[in-house]
Amino acid sequence: LTHEYKDAPEMRQLMREYQDQLRDIGLNGLGLLPPIPHSSGHKFVGTETCGKCHKTAFEIWEGTPHAHATASIVSPPEDPGYVARHFDPECISCHVTGWNPQEYYPYASGYLSLEQSGHLTGNGCENCHGPGAEHSAAEEEGSNISEEARIALRNAMKLPLEKAREKCMTCHDLDNSPDFHEPD
């Protein structure tokens, strides 16, 4: 249903019970794949790390719904009766950093919980650009990496425009974002 229809209290209660079960079972108990390495072989560091160098991009991101994606499933301010969904893999996969959004499993070093990996809240830079641990380490003063390797890591983080739509659609699909329209 659309947002024009109010949730029935009985359905909210069922959803609350379901979310409580997900919390109690935990990700391991759900039979999900164990966290697997990202196809790049790199690890996630979180958007704050990206923002140390990419200050303007970070400031813009902070003002977007992507920055508040996790908060929106924990407790959206406009709905005090909302049922938190931050234990639900189908929600987590697009509302945090470091999950496969189509197959609902975390990558190794990806988000696991607010307590364990709070630095990976929000739909961060790395969901589209790839895990940034090696790139950010290479950019640190005193790193022992060659300039050629540093440039290769930079290039690997670039998201060509033609690939951006594909990345967007992994979360903004018809099931989750039927009203999503690409900017002109």
Residue locations for each model-derived region?
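Acidic, metal/ion-coordinating pockets
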Residues: 1-4
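Non-transmembrane alpha-helical segments in soluble domains
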Residues: 126, 168-169
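Domain-level detector of nuclease and nuclease-like folds
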Residues: 161-166, 173-176
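Sequence context of c-type cytochrome heme-c attachment sites
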Residues: 6-163, 180-184
